[in-house]
C-alpha cells in the first residue's frame, strides 16, 4: 500500500512539474497567447495599410486627378500657365487678424 501511495505521489509531483515548469507549461501558454494578441494587432494594422495602398493604386490607375495631385504635392510641379505662390509666415493657422 505504501508503495502505491509513493507511486501516486511521484506521479502527481511529475505532472505538477510539467504543468508549471516544463515544456508546454501554463507560463508558456500565457506567453504564446500574448504573442498571438500582438500579432493579431500587427496584422490588423497591416490589413488597414494594404487597403489604403490598394485604394491609392486604384486611383492612380483610374484617372489623372490622383496622379496630378501626387505630382503637385510630392514633386512641386505646376500646370503650364499656372503661377505658384508660396506663403511664408507664422503658425497662426490661416486665421486673419481683425
Swiss-Prot record:
| Membrane topology type | Single-pass type II membrane protein
Q: Which Pfam families match?
A: DivIC (PF04977)
Keywords for the protein's UniProt record, in alphabetical order: Cell cycle, Cell division, Cell inner membrane, Cell membrane, Coiled coil, Membrane, Transmembrane, Transmembrane helix
Ranges in the topological domain labelled Cytoplasmic = 1-3
Task: Topology check: give the Periplasmic ranges.
Answer: 22-98
Its GO biological process annotations read: FtsZ-dependent cytokinesis
Report the transmembrane regions from the record: 4-21
Q: Is-annotated flag, keyword Coiled coil?
A: yes
Q: Which residues form a coiled coil?
A: 31-74
GO CC, sorted alphabetically, is: cell division site; cell septum; plasma membrane
User: According to its UniProt record, where is this protein mainly located?
Assistant: membrane
Q: Where in the cell is it found?
A: Cell inner membrane
**Oligomer status and interactors:** Part of a complex composed of FtsB, FtsL and FtsQ.
Reported function: Essential cell division protein. May link together the upstream cell division proteins, which are predominantly cytoplasmic, with the downstream cell division proteins, which are predominantly periplasmic.
NCBIfam families associated with the record: PRK00888.1 (NF002058)
Q: Which family does it belong to?
A: Belongs to the FtsB family.
Protein name as annotated? Cell division protein FtsB
- Which species? Shewanella pealeana (strain ATCC 700345 / ANG-SQ1)
